[in-house]
Amino acid sequence: MVSDRIVIDTVVGKYADHCPLYRQSAMLERDSGVELSRQTLDDWVMRVGELLAPLAERLRQELLGGSYLQADETPVGVQMHDGRGSNHLAYLWQYGRPQGAVVFEFRMGRGREGPKRFLGNFNGLLQSDGYAVYDSVGGPKMVHACCWSHARRKFIEAVKLHPGDAAAVRLVTHIDALFAIDAEACLAKLDQAARHALRSQKAPALLEEIQAAMTAARATALPASALAPKPRITRWRFGRNSHASCNTRNWS
């Protein structure tokens, strides 16, 4: 009979310390003289996953019961035992709220099946990096908002490529001013109503300047330029959705 502590240590070793099961098996034999096959350790991990599944589902339901979600997906390499010796590019999908719970879901691909199943008929505000798959999931009233950090990144790339590009520098400065509004609200610990009032006061003029600057830049930019892509229209709702963050990097 194995103790719970050994099983927990195995799971923590695999997922928190990134120590694969074959290595843990070898370490147990080397350090303790205990022979446990990788398959045995794998069975433990799978059983723990089964026991935690109801908890993960409860967290999912809690997230979907709210009005605001952030979503992101991170590529992970998965070792395949198909004889080719190459890794498969899978994805770890993350759903959560700032300073709230985060649920991770592993999927072998980046298609819409994963978020469609996870989100169900969610009709709140979903914020992402702008990945188009999120436009075709959720309930009929769901609003797909985007992330100013990802928009800003494009203009940072333009500044790095062309340091003297006044249009790109101006856009980065304006977007930074949007982040400063949220930083001011967080520093003052404003509630949602006060945050909305602050955004309503300061954001509209900035958004107009950003939109005008982007329109002007796109009129002269080459198609392959970092300034050429058209921003998603949901990004202009920043002033109205005061409960949404500027970005999707608020998992803690």
PLM region spans:
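Catalytic center-proximal scaffold of phosphoryl-transfer enzymes
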Residues: 1-252
